[in-house]
Amino acid sequence: AMAISSVLLLGAARFLPALQRDSLTSTRKLALEDEIWLRVFTVAKHLQRAGYCHGSCTGEGLEIVGQGDCVIVQWDANSNGIWDREPVKESDQIGFRLKEHVLETLRGATSCEGKGWDKVTNPDAIIIDTFQVVRQDVSGFSPVLTVNMRAASKSEPQTVVNASYSVTGFNL
């Protein structure tokens, strides 16, 4: 009985650290997935609103720049019939871009260049490899806008998450 107990105890002593390590790895991957999906859904919600105007707005509701790694969205948030540019804090434009493996945003964005962009992801924890918005136009229908994002954990680069989400641009 003592020998059997010793064998079981040694087996458990070997198994427990591996179980804890796998549990920690799974928890980190889930946290990374949650973070990336939250960002993808946020961008997609803005894309879905792009072009909305309760009046006669001028300009394009959506501007996809470069390879889709920067987008500028306009929509009439206060339904006053125009796309407000001033004051910047209440501007109807918002931009998202990938710069140096960080997703950034700027309220009142007019181009994808310049300073003043706020980091949306933490560069000390997450490396964004890919951020891309793709527009697919289908004759007779509203365009389909797809947000693609690929990210890795900075502490564990082998932990990678891919996310892709599509919305319809009804106002475009």
Model-predicted segments: where are they?
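Short, hydrophobic secondary-structure boundary micro-motifs
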Residues: 8, 55-56
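Type IV pilin-like appendage domain
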Residues: 60-138
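Short linear sequence signals and composition-biased patches located at protein termini or domain-edge surfaces
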Residues: 114-172
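Generic detector of ordered secondary-structure context
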Residues: 34-35, 88, 159
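Aliphatic-rich helix starts adjacent to a transmembrane/signal segment
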Residues: 1-48
